[in-house]
């Protein structure tokens, strides 16, 4: 959306289960978006090419339920309610205060200067781990790995700064023939 419409807005969720992808939410854009094509290409790129992996990019069902963003949310995103109220009373506002927010608020991280990616160290490390996990799978280093993988990194902070990595968890989908000893 943003490539073709820099002012576009997307508030969508994706649910994936065996053989089915559901994309739902709200989009405001002047451009066309081939959602089923994007879903299939993303699954293919991630390595979901066999129903034995839980989903096959070529044969899975793709259900799309997307509507235009509501006018209330659109107005809130365009200009914060507080700014709209203040503009009516005194006509002045700070640019940073003018930005509104939509109705979704699940967060994994936040912008900060802990890393070059401007994300918390926990998020940056997790992203690097799952990128390496994906590379190892795609290059066949561990031929039993399947596409689903995730990580969580816990960092201890002291005085607001990262002090040490406390815990690293990596979960990787794998074939049923792999023993626990092989995974350890």
Task: Kindly give the residue locations of the regions a language model identified.
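Active-site-surrounding "flap" and adjacent substrate/cofactor-binding loops of secreted or lumenal enzymes
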Residues: 29-43
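Short, charge-patterned binding micro-sites
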Residues: 10-29
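Short, N-terminal intrinsically disordered low-complexity segments that are rich in Pro/Gly
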Residues: 1-3, 25, 118
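Glycine-rich, mobile lid/loop segments that gate access to catalytic sites or pores
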Residues: 18-20, 37, 44-184
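N-terminal, positively charged regions that mediate nucleic acid binding
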Residues: 1-11
